[in-house]
Amino acid sequence: MKKIKFYCVTNKLINFIKFEEYNLAWVGKNNSPTGYIRCDYNDNIFYKEKNYSELTFHYWYWKNLLSLEKDDQWIGFCQKRRYWIKNNTKDSINKENINKYLLTNLSDEQNKFDSLICDSIKISGAKNIKLLKRGWRNILKEPRILFNDKYQNIKVHFDMHHGYGNLEKAIKLLDKDDRDDFYEYVKVNNYFNPHIMFISKKKIIKRWFETLFPWLERCEKEFGFKTLNGYDTTRIYAYLSERFLSYWFKKYTNYKEHPWRFLDV
């Protein structure tokens, strides 16, 4: 069994996790509670938290803490409402019983992989009225979206919920090694691995962040900050990262999907 060092990103007090493997990382506007890791000093993007969400801490971790980790240490990221849980968990999970089910280490079998990413979610199957309301421009180009779930892919879903054409604009700003492959990925898949959560080791995490954040900086020149508003686009940089993570870890690592649960806190 291999222990995992977790970083749980939150803007609310979390007082129900009992395991020392879980380090609480603060991204809230108020002063951080005692014992929480702050990410508003040294090399940081704390002023972008509104638009970057949990990536605010991820960036700080990359710049200030990752180099201090041991090469063979398993490192995981979660967030205040979403947690990794043990395999084969069937019970309903709440604050009172979550410590019984929280993932704290990897089995010998899981240790053979390079990374763990969240079990995927399917994003096709929207009702036709919603497709017509939010996806009409996509339907004009591909009418089969209305009749076949296969065509309700990641790109269509992003266009509907986070601004038509925004994902394609962002993909054009990727390095050539990923540009075509990621575009193909979002066109042929109608599921992705959500929440910008992963478990891996130092070498891969470093490579991931070295790819992700320079791309997001280029995206900032396209989308900026002032015009981002509402659910659709305020956190567009997090939404882009969420889709890109699914593609990147599958392309560059020997990955395994793992269960997670939403916790209403």
Regions found by a protein language model. Give the residues of each.
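ER/Golgi luminal nucleotide-sugar-dependent glycosyltransferases, focusing on the catalytic module
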Residues: 1-265
